[in-house]
Design a protein with these regions (language model features):
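Gly/Ala-rich beta-loop-alpha elbow adjacent to hydrolase catalytic centers
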Residues: 84, 88, 92
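Acidic catalytic loop of the alpha/beta-hydrolase fold
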Residues: 209-213
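Conserved alpha/beta-hydrolase catalytic His-Asp/Glu region
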Residues: 117, 138-184, 193-194
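Conserved HGGG/HGGXW glycine-rich cap/lid loop of the alpha/beta-hydrolase fold
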Residues: 1-54
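Active-site loop/oxyanion-hole signature of alpha/beta-hydrolase fold enzymes
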Residues: 43-83
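Flexible "cap/lid" loop of the alpha/beta hydrolase fold
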Residues: 97, 104-134
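Short beta-strand/loop motif that positions the catalytic acidic residue
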Residues: 198, 204-206
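Catalytic active-site module of serine/aspartate enzymes centered on a nucleophile-bearing elbow/loop
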Residues: 228-260
């Protein structure tokens, strides 16, 4: 599949992989400008099921891993540094299992190698809503996304949360076939044992107030990876890379500098 991508900057390449429903432009708000100034070539792309391919369905984790590998090869990025979040982190982990020669190092934010009981129940609820065909009012959809995305500190800061309320209300998530299929791009079994064979240097970042993929699940991934490190950032929810971009960017750039 010909996925839309953006390629800018010069230097060692960094491939950014977005989470469920996130377009490549997600990274252009806080990450791409900083990383290009730091001397990196930044490549972002729309995952299958997003943007021009939102009507796609029936694809699997293996399909999306293949998409990512094909883009790396098409742009001659290998071995590439990867920065990923949520579903994107899971794709990156499975890429490192299947095609380790393509990856130089990886930053895995808000990730997991298995689902605990709570996250499995959340997944069942999301799936039930998607299959019901019910369309939530934009304001209620925004409420849920705010609670899932940010820390209490941000939610209780009138100034910080104002723009997010407006943005989430104005741009509700569309229940497209692609978005529904993204629900299946997740561990269907415990994958931690498979990650014990991945020797690629990896930094796992957990966001302390993340209720979608809480930090203890990310710490498990870091512990499974032979060359894994773990960092937990306080006062951040699932979108911590947007909530505290300076802290996150500094941690990633320092990790890259340590793994030249």
């Amino acid at each position: 599949m010909n996925l839309a991508f953006d390629d800018r900057g010069t230097g060692d390449p960094v491939l950014f992989i977005a989470g469920r429903g996130g377009a490549g432009r997600t990274w252009h708000l806080h990450q791409v400008p900083v990383f290009t100034r730091a001397g990196y070539r930044c490549v972002t792309f729309d995952n299958r099921g997003i943007g021009a391919t939102e009507a796609a369905e029936g694809f699997t984790t293996e399909t999306m891993v293949g998409d990512t590998a094909a883009l790396i090869e098409k742009l001659d990025l290998a071995p590439v540094r990867i920065v990923a979040v949520s579903m994107g982190s899971y794709i990156a982990q499975e890429l490192m299992v299947a095609r380790p020669e393509l990856v130089r190092s990886a930053v895995l934010m808000a990730t997991r190698g298995r689902h605990d009981r709570t996250r499995d129940f959340f997944w069942q609820g999301e799936k039930a809503l998607a299959e019901s065909g019910i369309s939530l009012p934009a304001e209620f959809d925004a409420k849920v996304r705010l609670l899932e995305s940010f820390s209490p500190k941000t939610l209780n800061d009138d100034t910080a949360v104002r723009d997010w309320i407006d943005m989430f209300t104005m741009w509700p998530q569309k229940p497209t076939p692609g978005m529904r299929t993204h629900l299946t791009i997740a561990p269907q079994e415990n994958r931690l044992a498979a990650y014990q064979n991945v020797t690629i240097p990896s930094l796992v970042i957990g966001f302390a107030d993340d209720v979608v993929l809480p930090p203890h699940l990310g710490r498990e991934v870091a512990n499974a990876l032979p060359n894994g490190r773990y960092l937990e950032i306080p006062d951040t929810g699932h979108l911590g890379f947007i909530e505290k971009p300076e802290v996150v960017n500094t941690a990633i750039l320092n990790f890259f500098a340590d793994t030249l």
